[in-house]
Structures are given as C-alpha cells and as structure tokens.
C-alpha cells in the first residue's frame, strides 16, 4: 500500500529567518539541538520531521488499522478535547462511554451507539465551533478563549481524551511489548506532547488502594480506573488515555533567544501560519496512533499464541 500527499500551500520563504549558521533560534523549538546534532546539516523549511505535517502518515496508516479493528472486533476510537488553557470541560468522553456501557449492561457499545457518539462529536464542527468535544458549553467558551489569545499574539496549552471501545482483551505483553509502554511511547512521543496518562492518570496519586482498585464480578470489571490496561495487557474495558499538549511554541511576542552561533538576541517571529492551540487539530492523529498500536498488538498476540482467536476475559 502506497500513498502520496502533495502540499500546494507551502511557504518556504517564511523560514529564511532561521536558516544558515546565523539563523535565529525559535524558543520552544528544536532548532538549536537539531543544528548542533546534525553539525549544521538541517533543512529548516517547514520544520521537517519536527512538523505536525509529518503525522499525515500516522493518519493514513491509522485509517487502515481502524478498518481492521472495526471489522474484526467492532472497535471504535474517539477523541475529545477536554482542556484549553485553564478552562476544563465538565463533560468527559470517558463518562459518556460509561453511560453507553451501563445502558448495554456493561458489555459492548453497540454500532448504533458508536455512530451516534461520532455524530455528536462531528456536530460540534458543523455548528461553527472549532473544537471536537462532547461538551458543547465548553466548546463555545474555549473557542472564545482561543480567539482572544490569538489576538494577543500568544498561544494556549490543551489536553485531549482518546478512548477506544470494544477493545479485545488479552492483547499486549507483560514486559517488552507492554501495550501501556507502547501507547505512552506512541502518544507521548507525538510532537508537543508533554504528558500521557492512562485511565485515572495522575489522579491515582491522591487515592487509597481501596478507592482505586476496580471491583470485579463474574461478568467483568465494575469500574475502569485502570483505563483498560493492567500489567501492559488489555482487560476488555474501554482503553482510556489523556494527552496533554504544550502551548504552540511559535508566537509573535518578543522573546529572549540566540542565533545558532549563540549570539544573544531579542527574537521576534516575522512570518508564518501557526495555530494558537495545538489540541484543536491533534485528535485524529492520536486516534490513528492508538489504532496502529492496537492492531499491532492483535497481530503479535496471534503470532505468539496457540489460541489465536481468544480475545475474551469474561
């Protein structure tokens, strides 16, 4: 399978400010470390591999993985932006999915329910809101905050929930191919990501064991603090991740920086097209990377075990 994506909107001239041994170093970017690591042999146009443009390959591969997972297991993957700056959503994607599971007696989320949830997420875009989220009120407030911040020539951090439902159980390995480690590497390794949490994430640090342990009955787990992963292996519960992005590094405000020869300067961005909030566009890439890791884990499970069709725990 081969794919080619052509860009007709490139503006290479916007990067002249950063080119050559006297080029200016953008705070928050990889300019300085890439310049010295490559001994000066680096093409700054478009940001290269450090650009979010390169994740189009993830989306192409992820679209194929999603088809495979949906056909074999009914797996569906969703994302919802849940924080912009200090503003947090009051409705969570994981919570919406818990409601669907409760309606289905804790088993699988039906194709109809998956389609309805996807339609609800897409509806936010059709109404003119720029955010893909399950919380409509949050979307309107966050859109206003992003617009105001752009006018101030600044940027905002953000966070997204990424959730997979109808996930096959028993995939992943307890050590070197731990699905938790692979997901944290894949999602956490995405450009500008500063944190990747599984399940209840950092909230578990304030809990007692009696609060955090998920009760188990013969029909399955009664809660999902573990986020669908225990010991690097899936339990069949929804796979829940939260990914945090730093504010966009490219801003027009004056900043202290240096040239590549370490001459100190007051840096000002001269040209460029930059989003004030990275999380607005990141959802589809996170969904795609999650799909790729899940499909990879399924294929590894089938390659290593005799009972290759066993994907159930309860």
Regions inferred by a protein language model and the residue ranges of each:
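Short acidic, glycine/tyrosine-flanked loop/strand segments centered on an H-E-D-like triad
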Residues: 20-48, 256-274
């Amino acid at each position: 399978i081969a794919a080619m994506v052509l860009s007709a909107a490139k503006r290479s001239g916007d990067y002249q400010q950063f080119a050559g041994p006297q080029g200016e170093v953008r705070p928050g970017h990889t300019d300085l470390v890439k310049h010295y690591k490559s001994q000066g042999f680096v093409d700054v146009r478009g940001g290269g591999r450090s650009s979010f443009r390169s994740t189009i390959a993830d989306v192409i591969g992820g679209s194929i993985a999603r088809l495979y997972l949906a056909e074999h297991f009914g797996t569906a993957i969703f994302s919802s932006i849940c924080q912009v700056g200090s503003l947090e959503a009051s409705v969570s994607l994981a919570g919406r999915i818990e409601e669907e599971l409760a309606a289905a007696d804790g088993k699988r989320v039906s194709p109809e329910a998956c389609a309805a949830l996807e339609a609800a997420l897409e509806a936010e875009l059709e109404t003119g809101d720029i955010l893909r989220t399950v919380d409509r009120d949050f979307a309107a407030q966050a859109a206003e905050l992003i617009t105001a911040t752009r006018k101030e020539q600044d940027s905002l951090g953000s966070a997204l929930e990424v959730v997979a439902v109808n996930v096959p159980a028993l995939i992943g390995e307890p050590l070197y191919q731990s699905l938790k480690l692979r997901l944290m590497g894949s999602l956490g390794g995405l450009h500008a990501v500063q944190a990747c949490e599984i399940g209840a994430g950092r909230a578990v640090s304030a809990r007692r064991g009696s609060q955090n342990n998920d009760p188990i009955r013969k029909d399955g787990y009664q809660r999902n603090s573990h986020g669908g992963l225990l010991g690097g292996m899936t339990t069949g519960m929804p796979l829940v991740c939260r990914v945090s992005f730093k504010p966009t590094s490219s801003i027009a405000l004056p900043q202290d920086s240096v040239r590549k020869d370490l001459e100190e300067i007051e840096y000002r961005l001269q040209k460029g097209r930059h989003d004030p909030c990275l999380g607005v566009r990141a959802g589809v890439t996170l969904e795609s990377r999650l799909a790729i890791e899940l499909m990879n884990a399924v294929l590894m499970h089938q390659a290593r075990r005799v009972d290759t069709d066993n994907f159930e725990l309860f």
